[in-house]
Regions:
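Flexible, solvent-exposed loop/hinge segments and secondary-structure transition points
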Residues: 1-138
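Short beta->alpha transition motifs characteristic of CBS
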Residues: 44-49, 116-122, 291-297, 381, ...
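Exposed loop/turn and edge beta-strand positions of beta-sandwich/beta-sheet ligand-binding modules
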Residues: 100, 188, 229, 275, ...
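Short, solvent-exposed beta-strand edge segments and adjacent coil->beta transition regions
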Residues: 113, 141-145, 228-232, 315-317, ...
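Vicinal oxygen chelate
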Residues: 138-139, 148, 171, 200-202, ...
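An N-terminus-focused feature that recognizes amino-terminal "leader" regions
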Residues: 140-163, 167-237, 241-253, 423
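Core segments of cupin and vicinal oxygen chelate
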Residues: 149-200, 271-274, 321-374
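Flexible internal linker/loop segments at domain or repeat junctions
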Residues: 358-359, 375-397
Length: 465
């Protein structure tokens, strides 16, 4: 069963507080209302000096936005333009039309969860106050970063920056609590943090192991795309031929190992993926990467914005090898709150060439966050022989990848997830929820974390701010 998102009391108060903070800037005499997806009132506030009429109008605006899924300013423009019949909605919905600025629909994970209405000032000012409130809507789950374990994080960072357009942010010692979170208590770690577009990549290097901890292992030399430890990041590019030029030179010189036989264009019969161009390869340390160019009409709208500079645009998703699509859908969508963003089977010579396999049939399910990067699950039906995740995989091993997901704003949410992980086929790896000291929390961008494994062993770091 898909998770149905709804506004919680804490969400409602957060929206109202944010709107009130904006109204306080000019002491706006307004009323504020928040309703659920059915138009039922969840929260209300009337500022000093706000009229009785503003109270009724704020509720009407919120209800209209929620029940129609449209912002009331857009409805006003439509009614004044080519669609005056929209006024009949007032009769259909049994409430005032409220076709004036100040009512905004509230969406979460592409679903309508309610509306916020503000009234008492000009329509433009009402709309600005409502927008400040709507901006406080929680944005989780959100993929905060992907992490790869490296033997030499600085050398890996140089590769990503020189070859793939990443920018270096910083290098930090994440501290002992973070080391305990990733399963290496007492070890000395280094995190080199990179960014591409809106997304972040962390390169983890173990500088010194604690007594009794074994050395890290390299990738198996015979690793294949259908092994269950497989994980790549998909880097969206504007032009695949231009973006892959340096990589192809590295392959020719022997410094980079290919996965794909050559850049591939997915066939027209595959409606969901037709026209996508992609190329997979390994970094010098063995991590798997994909360069991908979306044709017009596919992928997030941001990948087609002309204002985005450069050839390398950002990270669309991290793909992971799995053994049971239905089980992984339950884990990622029901438990963690992502949404199913695509489901299909790729096969044929183009997929063989892309994955470096023969006779490929792979079911691909995409799992998306409300915004930003997502997770893609690769369930290879053919060829057989994909090997499971090593049961003793540790953070010092090159095959150790990690996806950090922001899942809330208080530690109790992590406790609730920890209690459910095993029932969805996963495993809690950290010694419970680990709360970071203030300095580490400020440096890392989260204040508490829980380390888990999905049903196939892929590492996830669930965090709250």
């Amino acid at each position: 069963m898909q998770r149905v998102h709804q506004l919680e009391p804490g969400d409602v108060q957060r929206l109202i507080d944010a709107a009130l903070a904006e109204a306080h800037v000019d002491e706006a005499q307004v009323s504020l209302a928040v309703v659920d997806g059915g138009g039922h009132l969840l929260g209300f506030h009337r500022r000093p000096g706000a009229s009785t009429a503003s109270a009724e109008a704020a509720i009407a605006k919120a209800r209209m936005a929620a029940l129609t899924g449209q912002d009331t300013a857009a409805m006003e423009s439509a009614i004044n333009g080519e669609r005056p019949a929209l006024l009949q909605l007032a009769t259909v919905l049994g409430q005032p039309a409220a076709a004036m600025g100040g009512g905004l629909s509230l969406r979460f994970a592409d679903g309508l969860v309610g509306g916020i209405g503000v009234s008492g000032m000009t329509p433009q000012r009402d709309a600005a106050i409502a927008a400040a409130g709507a901006a406080a809507l929680p944005i989780w789950p959100h993929l905060e970063a992907v992490s790869f374990s490296c033997g030499d994080a600085e050398a890996c960072a140089a590769f990503f920056c020189c070859q793939l357009g990443f920018r270096r942010l910083d290098a930090i010692d994440p501290g002992p609590d973070y080391a305990a979170l990733v399963g290496l208590p007492g070890a000395q770690l280094k995190l080199v943090r990179l960014a591409l577009g809106q997304e972040h990549l962390e390169l983890l290097e173990v500088r010194e192991l604690a007594p009794g901890q074994r050395p890290g292992r390299p990738f198996p030399s015979d690793a294949r795309s259908n092994d269950l430890w497989f994980q790549h990041i998909c880097i969206v590019v504007r032009d695949l031929n231009q973006a892959s030029a340096g990589v192809r030179e590295g392959i020719a010189s022997g410094t980079i190992a290919p996965i794909s036989s050559a850049p591939q264009r997915l066939p027209d019969w595959n409606t969901a993926a037709a026209g996508i161009e992609a190329f997979k390869f390994h970094t010098p340390e063995g991590h798997s990467l994909e360069l991908l160019a979306f044709p017009t009409g596919k992928g997030d709208a941001r990948w087609h914005e002309k204002s985005e500079p450069g050839v390398f645009l950002g990270i669309d998703h991290s793909a992971i090898g799995i053994s049971d699509s239905n089980r992984s859908c339950r884990f990622y969508d029901e438990l963690l709150g992502l949404r199913l963003g695509g489901d299909g089977v790729n096969h044929g010579p183009e997929q063989d060439g892309l994955d470096g396999l023969a006779g490929t049939q792979v079911r691909i399910t995409g799992h998306r966050c409300p915004s930003g990067a997502g997770i893609e699950c690769l369930d290879y039906r053919s060829p057989s022989g994909g090997r499971p995740m090593p049961s003793d995989l540790k953070a010092q091993d090159r095959a150790h990848g990690q996806i950090r997901l922001l899942v809330g704003d208080h530690a109790e949410q992590l406790e609730e997830l920890a209690a459910q992980v095993e029932s969805y086929g996963g495993q809690v790896l950290s010694p419970g929820v680990i709360t970071l000291p203030a300095a580490a929390a400020s440096q890392l961008g989260f204040r508490a974390g829980l380390q888990i494994a999905d049903p196939d062993g892929h590492r996830l770091q669930l965090v709250v701010r």
